[in-house]
Amino acid sequence: TGGLLPPGSFATMTRVVISGTGLYRPPHVITNAELVEAFNAYVGLQNEKNAAAIAAGSLPALAPSSVEFIEKASGIQQRYVLDKSGVLDPTRMYPRFQERPDDQISLMAEIAADASNQALAAAGKTGAQVDAVLCASANMQRAYPAMAVEIQQAIGAGGYGFDMNVACSSATFAIEQAANAVRAGTATCVLVVNPEITSAHLEWRDRDC
């Protein structure tokens, strides 16, 4: 409710809740043993390539890794990825993603739609009940058009939608915007989705990354 309140009255605060959540899990697993094998092969190739510079002292030799090193440093035992072959290729060590035609849903929107449908099911809602979609990510697949619009189409939502990029705090800012929209009455059911392809962010060739 907008406007000025008469003296002695109290504003009724709209209660905002998170009614459902969903989580997309990539289809492929890379174990520490697999990653170490690929990384150490990369180290061998690089040290061989730069042998003269390493011998002259102008370039340090790359150090190999181990399963024990990874687990002690991070506690990580395995990770889920969208593409496994590219990451484990010692001559590449980053994922391969095929460009999709414009008439297909984008990769990040597909991931987001999967998690969104899980969240809707958990909340007991349908896409038609969603009147705003906020797609928040630290690293967007593209600048425009908004992936939120693709997500709307994929789940059958109407209303409005837009993308947000606030680096590592994108999701928290989106949750705040969603809560504010409900409190302001511009939306009654807001979907916040945070698709991140983190395997494409990492420098797999850096042992300490």
What kind of region is each of these model predictions?
Residues 131-138:
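Short glycine-rich or small-residue beta-strand-to-loop segments that form or flank ligand, phosphate
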Residues 6-129, 155-156:
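Conserved "HGTGT" condensation-loop signature of ketosynthase/thiolase-family condensing enzymes
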Residues 2-3:
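Intrinsic, low-complexity polybasic segments
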Residues 73, 136, 193:
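Short acidic/histidine-centered micro-motifs embedded in hydrophobic/aromatic stretches
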